[in-house]
Swiss-Prot record:
UniProt KW Cytoplasm keyword: yes
Coiled-coil annotated spans: none
GO terms, biological process: lipid A biosynthetic process
Pfam families on file: PP-binding
Recorded metabolic or biological pathway in which this protein acts: Lipid metabolism; fatty acid biosynthesis
Modified how: 4'-phosphopantetheine is transferred from CoA to a specific serine of apo-ACP by AcpS. This modification is essential for activity because fatty acids are bound in thioester linkage to the sulfhydryl of the prosthetic group.
Key word Phosphoprotein present: yes
Residues in Carrier domain copies: 2-77
Gene3D superfamilies in UniProt: ACP-like (1.10.1200.10)
Function: Carrier of the growing fatty acid chain in fatty acid biosynthesis.
Protein's name in the database: Acyl carrier protein
GO cellular component: cytosol; membrane
Origin species: Carboxydothermus hydrogenoformans (strain ATCC BAA-161 / DSM 6008 / Z-2901)
Localization: Cytoplasm
Length: 77
């Protein structure tokens, strides 16, 4: 799990400009990390590129926390 989490965390830090210690499994992209809807779209695209997978819109809408993203990716890679 650490491998996926670390890669997801790096993308979030790079995209949102937040501190690494703010990125926890429980952190909400919007409420805790200050992302807006465009940021979320860009994060999903970055996850797709990094992990070479496609995240359908209906799945992307369910990814609200860092943990959601990590778990979703782990189930598919």
């Amino acid at each position: 799990m650490a491998g996926v989490f670390e890669r997801v965390k790096k993308i979030i830090v790079d995209q949102l400009g937040v501190e690494e210690d703010e990125v926890t499994m429980e952190a909400s992209f919007i409420d805790d990390l200050g992302a807006d809807s465009l940021d979320i779209v860009e994060l999903i695209m970055a996850f797709e590129e990094e992990f070479e997978l496609e995240i359908p819109d209906e799945d992307a809408e369910k990814i609200r926390t860092v943990g959601d993203a990590v778990n979703y990716i782990q189930e598919r890679v």
